Amino acid sequence: MTVAATTELEAVNIMMAAIGESPVNTLTGTLPADVVMAQSTLAEVNKEVQSEGWSFNTEIDVTQQRTNGTNHIDLSTDVLRIDPNIHQHPTIDAIQRGLKLYDRLNNTYVFSEDLICTIVYLRTFVEIPEPARRYITIKAARIFVDRLVGDEGLRTYTQQDEIRARAILMETDYVNADHNLLRGDPSLTSIFDTYNPSSALIR
């Protein structure tokens, strides 16, 4: 039997239940202050978790093209982390500044070529897999209770619940990312030579 993935509305209602409040039927229109806060906390945690870079929101060898006339490289608003492939662009040290790439090595926003990059994107809640939704919901619910009530004894979810949910997410991400010793880790081409959540798992 297929189990439906957690929706954003369900996630918010889980958070509302954690403070003993009734569920809501919609997240549009004029909402109570605590619902708005729950929604904001969920979005905050969603961005925080996705910023780590997982298989579901990381794309490798993406060509970032220069803008005609300026030769600047403009970024979309859903880019969380980006880095050029150091093997293909050894003379460039580009970082994100606002919605542009900036070359720290040459002190300029102007690039002489398009760049091949590894990019972590911010996906919407409905685009991410269920283990990620579950972990984000539990983490957000715990933070929401702490902020609104401030009483650890009223927590519906404990830190252990959060740890277990993260472990499931990491295991799922490890499988989906095709990590293995023979083929290597496809995500370790540039920016993520230092860290990728599921690469921390000991097999």
Task: Describe each PLM feature range.
Residues 27, 57, 152-153:
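Short linear functional motifs in flexible/disordered or boundary regions
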Residues 17, 22, 52-54, 58, ...:
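Flexible, active-site-adjacent loop/turn segments at secondary-structure boundaries
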Residues 2-6, 11, 96-203:
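Internal mixed-charge
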Residues 1-40, 195-203:
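Short, extreme N-terminal leader segments that mark the start of a protein/domain
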Residues 27-29, 89-92, 113:
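N-terminal start-of-chain detector that recognizes signal peptides
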Residues 35-107, 131-148, 157, 166-169:
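Divalent metal-cofactor coordination and adjacent catalytic microenvironments
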